[in-house]
Design a protein with these regions (language model features):
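Vicinal oxygen chelate
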Residues: 16-19, 50, 70-115
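Conserved catalytic-core motifs of GNAT/GCN5-like acyltransferases
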Residues: 12-14, 31-39, 96-98, 121-125
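Residue-level marker for the onset of beta-strands and adjacent loop->beta junctions
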Residues: 9, 42-44, 68, 102-104
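Conserved short beta-strand elements that form part of the metal-binding/catalytic scaffold
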Residues: 32-67, 115-120
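Conserved acetyl-CoA-binding loop of GNAT-fold acetyltransferases
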Residues: 26-33, 89-90
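N-terminal beta-strand motif that seeds the catalytic metal site of vicinal oxygen chelate
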Residues: 1-22, 68-70, 119-125
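Short secondary-structure boundary/capping segments
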Residues: 1-3, 46-47, 60-62, 97-98, ...
Length: 125
């Protein structure tokens, strides 16, 4: 099996407080799948899922740096925007076509300034 057969990539984002980040991601509709601690009291490494999309959140300082960027392709970014507003999410940038007529995009910042972009491709070649 080679890389060509790979079907899944999971980005990891650095967070200062897993508890605060978990609450934020749950406000977006994500749900905790699992958490891991090497020992009790040590930093948290966790998996969060939303409609089959997975991200890892890590309190471990050596894993990655705050200020990451992740793109999520979703079926309807405008409907998701409405959901986020109903959930009380502070959306950084409302859905727009700044990246081209065939791509709708909105962005949200998490508590650690990781940018999450949600995109809908409106036309496929």
């Amino acid at each position: 099996m080679g890389l060509r057969d790979a079907q899944r990539v999971v980005p990891a984002l650095r967070v200062a407080s897993y508890a605060a980040s978990k609450a934020f991601y749950e406000s977006l509709g994500f749900r905790e799948e699992w958490t891991h601690h090497v020992e009790p009291g040590l930093p948290t490494f966790a998996s969060m899922m939303l409609d089959g999309m997975e991200i890892f959140l890590s309190e471990h300082s050596g894993d990655c740096q705050p200020g990451g960027l992740v793109h999520f392709y979703v079926p309807d970014v405008d409907a998701l925007y409405d959901d986020f507003l109903a959930y009380g999410v502070n959306v950084e940038q409302a859905p727009n076509n700044d990246l081209g007529a065939d791509l709708r995009v909105m962005s949200v910042l998490d508590p650690d300034n990781n940018r999450l972009k949600f995109l809908t491709q409106t036309h496929w070649e």
